[in-house]
Curated annotation (Swiss-Prot):
Region of interest: Disordered: 1-23
Gene field: arc
Pathway(s) where this gene product acts: Protein degradation; proteasomal Pup-dependent pathway
Domain-level remarks: Consists of three main regions, an N-terminal coiled-coil domain that binds to protein Pup and functions as a docking station, an interdomain involved in ARC hexamerization, and a C-terminal ATPase domain of the AAA type.
Coiled-coil segments on the chain, per record: 47-94
The name this protein goes by in its record: Proteasome-associated ATPase
A Pfam short name: AAA
Gene3D superfamilies: 1.10.8.60, 1.20.5.170, Nucleic acid-binding proteins, P-loop containing nucleotide triphosphate hydrolases
Length: 588
């Protein structure tokens, strides 16, 4: 056995070439044992190798991800370096200047204005020279060459246009201290209709004006749109409407007949009367009706007229001459509109606030210059064609007589307080069949809405105009000792009727919400009349008794004493006397 091991150690396989079968068998058994041992160890070795492979693959994936992160970091660093370089280059560039383009030259250069100097510079190929316009802002490089076209200037000083010069490219303007200056018209103003008096935006360094700036102080006072109120929406003033239509519409619609009869159309109309009776409504309806008549005469689908609504008190200005200037601007605009053949209505509301009697001593005497300005505009050297002046006032006695004389405000129309018939007409404008009516009121008239509404109006008017104890308002004492009782009907107005209907509608809504009873009832109207009268109870407290004479139409005798006769809702007499007080209150 020892010999066999020695043979093995020497690399000699025992039994090979030996003729001893037993030795060969032993050798083979040893080989089999070795192979079996190796075969048993092979899976474990394979598993170790596989685990090693997995570990290496994991390490490889981690290294690859790390490489990707490093590559991404390098790319970001490179981008940041490039961006920083660009930022450094950008910050290192010299500043770019701006200038105003004046004109292009035949050699491809351009004349610009910059830094108070007029320069001739080159233009970058990236800028289309033919597309540059006069007054346009351009960007300049350090060599003062044009490298980019910009927008027009949008800020500057406000100047007033005096006139356009003959070349059509320059204008004479007035600054804020009334100094005159000749400026250039920028391209946006070329071809536009600009009028003397318009406010323009001036860039003072280059001397260009760029745009027309709306004049807020005049635009707020003037309403050019035609109101959408028609004569059919006005109740109880049929006679007055016919008079104003004859005065305003006929001269424009039939000018040949007026020339044939050598009849001069009226220049102005005065609407006077108590407040709330429809003076402003009529003036608005005149413009609307005139536009429709123009459409009929010209055959156009939609006629055109202008309604310049002048808010009288807002024209007053603390600076001397400003009010007169604004009046001139108003009539200048009216003449421009009328020169196109379009009728223009200039409406002065609350006319007595502007054109009071001169020398009356009841104001700051600004009317000493305002009234002559209006007179010069109405019938001065520069006449008015296709322009009608309409004034509205509830104190016509305070207007200067020179304005009211024939040839200026030729037609004077008094807007009376509504009588019973007129009140029915006014009620019919606000109380219509479209409104929800209560079933009980409808049942009394066999579900006839028209009959129900007519009955409600009749009942309300009868209560308003009844000379009953509940409707007594004032007892006036005249200077000759006579006394007269005035009722609420003597102070009724269209505005009051509208308010009464509004109160009744609100009562109907509250009844529906509280009692689930839907519809307007006659009781709502009657209660609304009582509430309206009750609210007017205290109005005489701040009124001069002389004003009541003008309101009631009894101007022949002076009122020296007034006593209220209002009966409260609980039946208590709340009558009291009112002595003569200063003329401070609003006029009923």
């Amino acid at each position: 056995m020892a010999a066999h091991d020695d043979d093995m150690n020497r690399g000699i396989r025992p039994g090979r070439g030996s003729e001893d079968p037993a030795g060969q068998v032993a050798y083979l058994e040893q080989e089999i044992a070795v192979l079996r041992r190796k075969l048993a160890e092979s899976p474990r070795h394979t598993r170790i190798l596989e685990e090693r492979i997995v570990e290496l693959q994991t390490n490889l994936a981690g290294v690859s991800a790390q490489n990707e992160r490093l590559a991404g970091t390098l790319r970001e660093a490179r981008d940041q370096i490039v961006a920083l370089k660009e930022e450094v280059d950008r910050l290192a560039q010299p500043p770019a200047g701006f200038g105003v383009f004046l004109q292009a030259n035949e050699d491809g250069t351009a004349d610009i204005f910059t830094g108070g100097r007029k320069l001739r510079v080159n233009v970058s190929p990236s800028v289309e020279l033919d597309e540059l316009r006069r007054g346009q802002e351009v960007m300049l490089n350090e060599a003062l060459n044009v490298v980019e076209a910009m927008e027009y200037e949008s800020v500057g000083d406000i100047v007033t246009l005096k006139e356009i010069l003959e070349d059509g490219e320059r204008a004479l303007v007035l600054g804020h201290t009334d100094e005159e200056r000749v400026v250039r018209l920028a391209e946006p103003l070329r071809g536009l209709t600009i009028r003397p008096g318009d406010a323009l935006l001036l860039e003072p360094r280059s001397g260009y004006v760029y745009e027309v700036v709306p004049k807020s102080e005049v635009e707020e006072l003037v309403l050019e749109e035609v109101p959408d109120i028609g004569y059919e929406q006005i109740g109880g003033l049929g006679g007055q409407i016919e008079m104003i239509r004859d005065a305003v519409e006929l001269p424009y619609l039939y000018p040949d007949l007026f020339r044939e009869h050598e009849l001069r159309p009226p220049k102005g109309v005065l609407l006077y009367g108590p407040p709330g009776c429809g003076k402003t409504l009529i003036a608005k309806a005149v413009a609307n009706s005139l536009a429709k008549k123009v459409a009929e005469v010209t055959g156009q689908a939609a006629g055109k007229s202008f309604f310049l609504n002048i808010k009288g008190p807002e024209l007053l200005n603390k600076y001397v001459g400003e009010t007169e200037r604004q009046i001139r601007l108003v009539f200048q605009r009216a003449r421009e509109k009328a020169s196109e053949g379009t009728p223009v209505i200039v409406f002065f509301d609350e006319m007595e606030s502007l054109f009071r009697t001169r020398g009356s001593g009841v104001s700051s005497d600004v009317e000493n210059t305002i009234v002559p300005q209006l007179l010069a505009e109405i019938d001065g050297v520069e006449g008015l064609q296709n322009v009608v002046v309409i004034g509205a006032s509830n104190r016509e006695d305070m207007i200067d007589p020179a304005i009211l004389r024939p040839g200026r405000l030729d037609v004077k129309i008094k807007i009376e307080r509504p009588d019973a018939e007129a009140a029915k007409d006014i009620f019919g404008k606000y109380l219509t069949e479209r409104l929800p009516l209560h079933s009980d009121d409808l049942a009394e008239h066999e579900k006839d809405k028209s009959a129900t509404v007519s009955s409600m109006i009749q009942t309300a008017v009868e209560q308003m105009y009844a000379e009953s104890e509940e409707n007594r308002f004032l007892e006036v004492t005249y200077a000759n000792g006579d006394k007269e009782v005035l009722y609420f009907k003597d102070f009724n107005s269209g505005a009051m009727i509208e308010n009464i209907v509004g109160r009744a509608k609100k009562m109907a809504i509250k009844d529906f919400l509280d009692k689930n009873q839907k519809g307007l009832r006659v009781s709502h109207l009657l209660q609304a009349c009582v509430d309206e009268f009750k609210e007017n109870e205290d109005l005489p407290n701040t009124t001069n008794p002389d004003d009541w004479a003008r309101i009631s139409g009894k101007k022949g005798e002076r009122i020296v004493y007034i006593r209220t006769l209002v009966t409260g809702k609980q039946g208590a007499d709340t009558g009291r006397s009112i002595d003569t007080v200063a003329n401070t209150g609003q006029y009923l």
